[in-house]
């Protein structure tokens, strides 16, 4: 009987131990689950609030390399429409646009990109110095006029006397079928004032054609570019004079070499700075008087010279055919 009682007691104690282990296991699981759930909940909240960041082992190295800035991050533009470029991007733009301008000079996008990629800061700063040293140049920089069909009032210019700058200008536009509205806004030159100086040069280009009478055919463009380079110093003008003739016929190169290069260099170097001319305020001025004041002589009529050349070649062919 005593033995039976002891066995019963052991059985009861075993049941109690089993329940106790079960309770402890359940309690431990509950506490651990609550802890993990709470931790996951906190992590989820941090992720949602943007407070959780992935640890980058290269972070310290990247901060030293890029001075705390992400690579290739664009800096703040200097003016509306400005696209800041890294130096390597400027080099790539120069290489691409120079090749494009050489093989496809009729494509304005290559000419525009080449002009801005070569308009280096020291050249533009020198032009700014010239403008600041001249009362008219200072006025232009202060007022920053822009040339459009509306601002120039082409209808009014057509009503001016034939000997005026304005009438010569609008006649040249009509004859060559061009418009002042086609000039593209500067985008890739840093510094707002330097960008305006280049924009001013770009918009005045047609006036240089008008006062010299040179057409927009490639020979005329090259002659004007040499004239601009000698007077203003824009690098693209010099590059155009150097490489553009390589694609011309021998007769065209001969005309440039014997007539238009000497004229452009002489008149560009010894005339007054064209960048300081406030064209909008002298449209009613006599064009011959203006040329005399600036020290500019008109070159021979290029279109007439071409006509005479082709007429001569045609006559030679006819004479050879009659033999």
Curated annotation (Swiss-Prot):
Stretches of the chain forming a coiled coil according to its record: none
Domain of life the protein comes from: Eukaryota
Binding residues for Zn(2+): 205-206, 209, 221
Entry keyword set: Lyase, Membrane, Metal-binding, Mitochondrion, Mitochondrion inner membrane, Ubiquinone biosynthesis, Zinc
Listed GO CC annotations: extrinsic component of mitochondrial inner membrane; mitochondrion
Membrane topology, from the record: Peripheral membrane protein
Cofactor(s) needed by this chain: Zn(2+)
Reaction it catalyzes: a 4-hydroxy-3-methoxy-5-(all-trans-polyprenyl)benzoate + H(+) = a 2-methoxy-6-(all-trans-polyprenyl)phenol + CO2
Family matches, as InterPro entries: Coq4, Coq4_euk
Subcellular location: Mitochondrion inner membrane
GO process annotations (BP): ubiquinone biosynthetic process
Pathway listed: Cofactor biosynthesis; ubiquinone biosynthesis
EC number: 4.1.1.130
Other known facts: This protein may be expected to contain an N-terminal transit peptide but none has been predicted.
Biological role stated in the UniProt entry: Lyase that catalyzes the C1-decarboxylation of 4-hydroxy-3-methoxy-5-(all-trans-polyprenyl)benzoic acid into 2-methoxy-6-(all-trans-polyprenyl)phenol during ubiquinone biosynthesis.
Subunit structure: Component of a multi-subunit COQ enzyme complex, composed of at least COQ3, COQ4, COQ5, COQ6, COQ7 and COQ9.
Family: Belongs to the COQ4 family.
Name of this protein: Ubiquinone biosynthesis protein COQ4, mitochondrial
Gene it is expressed from: COQ4
């Amino acid at each position: 009987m005593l033995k039976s009682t002891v066995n019963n007691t052991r059985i009861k104690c075993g049941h109690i131990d089993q329940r106790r282990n079960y309770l402890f296991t359940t309690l431990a699981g509950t506490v651990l689950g609550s802890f993990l759930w709470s931790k996951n909940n906190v992590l989820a909240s941090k992720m949602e609030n943007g407070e959780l960041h992935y640890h980058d082992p290269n972070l310290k190295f990247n901060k030293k390399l890029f001075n705390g800035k992400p690579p290739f991050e664009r800096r703040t533009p200097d003016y509306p429409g400005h696209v800041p470029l890294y130096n390597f991007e400027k080099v790539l733009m120069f290489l691409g646009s120079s090749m494009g301008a050489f093989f496809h000079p009729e494509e304005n996008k290559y000419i525009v990109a080449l002009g801005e990629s070569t308009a280096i800061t020291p050249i533009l700063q020198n032009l700014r110095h010239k403008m600041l040293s001249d009362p008219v140049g200072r006025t232009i920089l202060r007022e920053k006029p822009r040339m459009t069909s509306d601002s120039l009032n082409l209808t009014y210019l057509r009503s001016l006397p034939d000997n005026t700058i304005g009438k010569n200008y609008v006649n040249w536009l009509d004859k060559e079928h061009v418009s002042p509205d086609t000039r593209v806004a500067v985008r890739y030159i840093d510094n707002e004032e330097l960008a305006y100086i280049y924009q001013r040069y770009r918009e005045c280009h047609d006036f240089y054609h008008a006062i010299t009478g040179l057409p927009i055919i490639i020979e005329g463009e090259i002659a004007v570019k040499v004239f601009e380079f000698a007077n203003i110093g824009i690098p693209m003008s010099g590059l155009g004079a150097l490489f553009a003739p390589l694609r011309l016929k021998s007769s065209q190169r001969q005309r440039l070499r014997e007539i238009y290069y000497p004229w452009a260099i002489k008149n560009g170097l010894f005339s007054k700075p064209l960048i300081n001319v406030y064209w909008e305020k002298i449209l009613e001025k006599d064009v011959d008087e203006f040329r005399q004041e600036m020290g500019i002589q008109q070159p021979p009529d290029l279109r007439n010279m071409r006509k005479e050349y082709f007429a001569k070649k045609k006559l030679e062919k006819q004479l050879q055919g009659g033999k």
